[in-house]
């Protein structure tokens, strides 16, 4: 967002529009998340189990299989985003992604009030697909219009929109879960999607005077004609230690997040009555998102006043919170501790960690921002999920038992063992944060020097013309 093209008034207007854009995108996600999860877990409640050959599974274990399918979905999504981003930039990418989401939402709304097993599974996958599409379109637009000089100052406020959207969506769902049926929730999502397209149009109109923000091409950039979409992104990532470390942060977060989510879901499945499952999900999600809103608001104020903060400090907040809550759950495997696992994840993952992670892409070349980011944030993210699911799947397979009524029951010991595994992953996560922190500061210094030289040359040219 160079000052030559944007007045202060336009900067404020653009920031407000992008704030509302990400706010509504996350509102959609936090309506879909408890809705899809409660439908899925409620489908296999002990009386009815999911059968895979001779194996019987509860909803929490069947959910692991549903998430495992995300790897294939991720591959197709990387290809789709890479190909579409070559033809559509900024607001046009939003139109493509949001149009697909609206069409799919309408199709599900025709069956969602009385869903069969064949509807619940695709709807569960749709929940993950929709947020990946919305975030990819949003952050690609944002990175293409904001330069590094403004990124650390503005990203905090814009990501505050994401956090507030989470608080609005989860709180609204919790408050109206008894009043609205499933179809009405999906009709609400369609309406929000149309508004997002209008906001993208407004942001695109304001940003049309800004040339596509492009950092100097790096030596690792890959000619587009040489590779297909997925391989192109992988080639960029694995030739850069910086991008590998970013991929590590994303992958290790997804592993820990999925393990925490399984522990949380299994505890709810074991201790919460079926009729209260949706309400409990909504309550925990609302608490986590409201806490994230408070954290992000405080951070945004701090970042605006002190834009030269060190990036690695905010990237350490989430893994530290995950480690502490996991240790507490190992000591006391109760419903409160399991809920705290999810709250600690939501509080920092959707606030300062998201801000820091997105800022890491800003000093990269355009090809890395679009193609490498799509590979990391979609494919690596889903790969991390699948790795966690395979590990978590072993717990019910070997340790689950049956209660006195003959129903399957999740093993508390197995859930505690997963807590120990999480602590090991967090240690690797810390190492990746150290690498990106050092490299980001180096890239930041290089861009500041380049900006200083460019300004000096611009001042010398008028002087030379007058002599």
Short names for language-model regions:
Residues 1-21, 46, 63-64, 80-81, ...:
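Intracellular loop-helix junctions on the cytosolic face of multi-pass helical membrane proteins
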Residues 14-46, 50-78, 119-178, 225-236, ...:
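Substrate-agnostic recognition of the 12-TM MFS/MFS-like secondary transporter fold
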Residues 60, 90-91, 148, 182-186, ...:
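Membrane-helix interface/capping residues of multi-pass secondary transporters
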Residues 99-116, 320-334:
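C-terminal ends and interior cores of transmembrane alpha-helices
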Residues 120, 153-209, 279, 283-294, ...:
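Hydrophobic alpha-helical transmembrane segments
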Residues 243-253, 311-318:
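Alpha-helical transmembrane segments of multi-pass integral membrane proteins
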Residues 297-314, 330, 394-402:
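Flexible, glycine/threonine-enriched loop-and-boundary segments that flank and lead into catalytic domains
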Residues 313-352:
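C-terminal transmembrane helical hairpin of 12-TM major facilitator-type secondary transporters
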